[in-house]
C-alpha cells in the first residue's frame, strides 16, 4: 500500500521553482499548459492553478494531465469549474497523481473528488493519503473462496444471490428504484453485518445525495454524536460538476475502500451510483480531448477505462471489496455499449423491471432476467437451488400463458395451468417486500428476511399448502408467517363488512 505523508510548505516551494507552467489555452474544462523544456509532468500528474480572477476572488483549480502534445505542451482536464482562469496564469506540477485521505478519519464524512470534506464538519486528518491511480492486485494476492453475501432481500437472496468480494450490477431505466435498493442494502449491511461501506455518488442528483446523507444519519449508519463510530464514507461527484470530477470520483471512492481492505484487513462494501455516469463522463472528456468517437458516440477507450476501475475491485488474502453498482440503461436498451461493457465484469445482475414497478411490486426486481454465477447446487446447496429453479419455472410458465389469458380468459386454461397461474401470482407478490428506507413513504415497517426463512416461504407456496390464502395476503410482507397473519386479518375485515 503506497502511503503519501503530507508534504511540508518548503517542499512545495521547491516543486514550484522546478516545475512551473503557464496556461496557453482554455476550452471549457480542458486546459493546455506550456512547461519549460525538460520539466514536463507525467500522465495523470495533478496540476494546481492558483491565483485571483478579475473580481479578485481566490482561484484554486486542480487538473489532471491526460495528454502530452509535444512542443513542451500538455493537455489537462479540470476537476472543478474553470471560471475566472485566464491565459498566462501559473500552473504548478505537484509531481504526483491526485492523492486522497484514507482510513478511519474518512468514516461519517462527505468528500469531493479531491478528497476535500464538503460537509462543513471541519478538516479531516490527512496524514495518511493514497494516490487514486494504482494497479490492480497481482493474481497471487487474490482470494478465490466462494461465499454468499446475505442481503435480507428475498428476491435477491433466493434467485440471484450476491457473492462476497465480487461485483453486482443493478440494471434499470429511470425511476424504477435503483437508488432505493442501494440505500436498503447499505442499511441492511450496516445493521446485520456491521461492515464498513464506501458510497461513490458518480454523476447523480445532488438532491439524492443529500437525501441519502440525511437517511444515514436517521438510521444511525452515520453517528452524528461520535463520527468515528460511523459505518460509511461518502464521496460525491454530482451531475452539476465538470466531467473530469465525475470521471475520477469513482476512483476516489475505490481508493478509500482499498485502504480498509489492504491495511485494516476488513470486508468492505463499495456502492457506485451510477456506473453509467462514469462512462458518460469519460465520453465527454474523450470528445474534449479530440478522440474519434466509437459506437453510439462512446469513447474508443471504453473497455480500457471500465477495466482499470473494475479490476481493482476484488478479494485479496487481506480482505474483500464487494461492489454493488447501479447501472442506468439508456432507453431500457441492454445492448447499449455502456451497460454491455459493464455486464462483462459482473458476477450477479439484479435487473429492475418497469412492468413490475407499474404493478406496484417493489423491489421491482425481474426474477427471470436477474442472474448470478452463485446459483449452482454445489455452492448454495440442493435445497436452495431446487427452490429457486421451481420458482423460476412457475413464473416462466405464467409468462407463457399470459397471452392466452389476455385473449381467451382464465376459464379456458386446464386445471393444472390455472393452479400454476394462481401460485405464480402469489410468488410474484411474495417477492415484494417492505423496505426500511421506504417506511416514510409506505407507512409499512421494513423487514429483513434471512435466507432460510425465504427458502421455507417459497417451498410452502410451491407445495400448495397456501393455495387457500388470498393473493393480497402475500403482498408487501416479510416472512411466510406474516402472510398467514395478514390472511386472517383480511378474513376478519371481510366478515365485518358483511
From Swiss-Prot:
Where does the record place it? Plastid, Chloroplast thylakoid membrane
Gene Ontology biological process: proton motive force-driven mitochondrial ATP synthesis
Keywords, alphabetical: ATP synthesis, ATP-binding, CF(1), Chloroplast, Hydrogen ion transport, Ion transport, Membrane, Nucleotide-binding, Plastid, Thylakoid, Translocase, Transport
Write out the residues that bind ATP.
172-179
Topological relation to the membrane, as annotated:
Peripheral membrane protein
Q: What is its EC number?
A: 7.1.2.2
One GO CC annotation: mitochondrion
Q: Can the keyword Translocase be found in this entry's annotation?
A: yes
**Which Pfam family, giving just one, matches this sequence?**
ATP-synt_ab
Under Gene3D superfamilies, the record lists:
2.40.10.170, Bovine Mitochondrial F1-atpase, Atp Synthase Beta Chain, Chain D, domain 3 (1.10.1140.10), P-loop containing nucleotide triphosphate hydrolases (3.40.50.300)
Q: Which reaction does it catalyse?
A: ATP + H2O + 4 H(+)(in) = ADP + phosphate + 5 H(+)(out)
Q: Does the keyword Chloroplast apply?
A: yes
Protein family (similarity comment): Belongs to the ATPase alpha/beta chains family.
Assembly, per entry: F-type ATPases have 2 components, CF(1) - the catalytic core - and CF(0) - the membrane proton channel. CF(1) has five subunits: alpha(3), beta(3), gamma(1), delta(1), epsilon(1). CF(0) has four main subunits: a(1), b(1), b'(1) and c(9-12).
Per the entry, what this protein does is: Produces ATP from ADP in the presence of a proton gradient across the membrane. The catalytic sites are hosted primarily by the beta subunits.
Annotated protein name in UniProt: ATP synthase subunit beta, chloroplastic
| The organism of origin for this protein | Phormium tenax
Q: Which gene encodes it?
A: atpB
Amino acid at each position: 500500500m503506497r502511503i503519501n505523508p503530507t508534504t511540508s510548505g518548503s517542499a512545495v516551494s521547491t516543486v514550484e521553482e522546478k516545475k512551473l507552467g503557464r496556461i496557453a489555452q482554455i476550452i471549457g474544462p480542458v486546459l493546455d499548459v506550456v512547461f519549460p523544456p525538460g520539466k514536463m509532468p507525467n500522465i495523470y500528474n495533478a496540476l494546481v492553478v492558483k491565483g485571483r480572477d478579475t473580481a479578485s476572488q481566490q482561484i484554486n483549480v486542480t487538473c489532471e494531465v491526460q495528454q502530452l502534445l509535444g512542443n513542451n505542451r500538455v493537455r489537462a482536464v479540470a476537476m472543478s469549474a474553470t471560471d475566472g482562469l485566464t491565459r498566462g496564469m501559473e500552473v504548478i506540477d505537484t509531481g504526483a497523481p491526485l492523492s486522497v485521505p484514507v482510513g478511519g478519519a474518512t468514516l461519517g464524512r462527505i468528500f469531493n473528488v479531491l478528497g476535500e470534506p464538503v460537509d462543513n464538519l471541519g478538516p479531516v486528518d490527512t496524514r495518511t493519503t493514497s494516490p487514486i491511480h494504482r494497479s490492480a492486485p497481482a493474481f497471487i494476492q487474490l482470494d478465490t473462496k466462494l461465499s454468499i453475501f446475505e442481503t435480507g432481500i428475498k428476491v435477491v437472496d433466493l434467485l440471484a444471490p450476491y457473492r462476497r468480494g465480487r461485483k453486482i450490477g443493478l440494471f434499470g431505466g429511470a425511476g424504477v428504484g435503483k437508488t432505493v435498493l442501494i440505500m436498503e442494502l447499505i442499511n441492511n449491511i450496516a445493521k446485520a453485518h456491521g461492515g464498513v461501506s464506501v458510497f461513490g455518488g458518480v454523476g447523480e442528483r445532488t438532491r439524492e445525495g443529500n437525501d441519502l446523507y440525511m437517511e444515514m444519519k436517521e438510521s444511525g449508519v452515520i453517528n452524528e454524536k461520535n463520527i468515528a463510530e460511523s459505518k460509511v464514507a461518502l464521496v460525491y461527484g454530482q451531475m452539476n460538476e465538470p466531467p473530469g470530477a465525475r470521471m475520477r470520483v469513482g476512483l476516489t471512492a475505490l481508493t478509500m475502500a482499498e485502504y480498509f481492505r489492504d491495511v485494516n484487513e476488513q470486508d468492505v462494501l463499495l456502492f457506485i451510483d451510477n456506473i453509467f455516469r462514469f462512462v458518460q463522463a469519460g465520453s465527454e472528456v474523450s470528445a474534449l480531448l479530440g478522440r474519434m468517437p466509437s459506437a453510439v458516440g462512446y469513447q474508443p477507450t471504453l473497455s480500457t477505462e471500465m477495466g482499470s476501475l473494475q479490476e481493482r475491485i476484488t478479494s485479496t488474502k487481506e480482505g474483500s471489496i464487494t461492489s454493488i453498482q447501479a447501472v442506468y440503461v439508456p432507453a431500457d436498451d441492454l445492448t447499449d455499449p455502456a451497460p454491455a461493457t459493464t455486464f462483462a465484469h459482473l458476477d450477479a445482475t439484479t435487473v429492475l423491471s418497469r412492468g413490475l414497478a407499474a404493478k406496484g411490486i417493489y423491489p421491482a426486481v425481474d426474477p427471470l432476467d436477474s442472474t448470478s454465477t452463485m446459483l449452482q447446487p454445489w455452492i448454495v446447496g440442493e435445497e436452495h437451488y431446487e427452490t429457486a429453479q421451481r420458482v423460476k419455472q412457475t413464473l416462466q410458465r405464467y409468462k407463457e400463458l399470459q397471452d392466452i389469458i389476455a385473449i381467451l380468459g382464465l376459464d379456458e386454461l386446464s386445471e393444472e395451468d390455472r393452479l400454476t397461474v394462481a401460485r405464480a401470482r402469489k410468488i410474484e407478490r411474495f417477492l415484494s417486500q417492505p423496505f426500511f428506507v421506504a417506511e416514510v413513504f409506505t407507512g409499512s415497517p421494513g423487514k429483513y428476511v434471512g435466507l432460510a426463512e425465504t427458502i421455507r416461504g417459497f417451498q410452502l407456496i410451491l407445495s400448495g399448502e397456501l393455495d387457500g390464502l388470498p393473493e393480497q395476503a402475500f403482498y408487501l410482507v416479510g416472512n411466510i408467517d406474516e402472510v398467514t397473519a395478514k390472511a386472517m386479518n383480511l378474513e376478519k375485515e371481510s366478515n365485518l363488512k358483511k
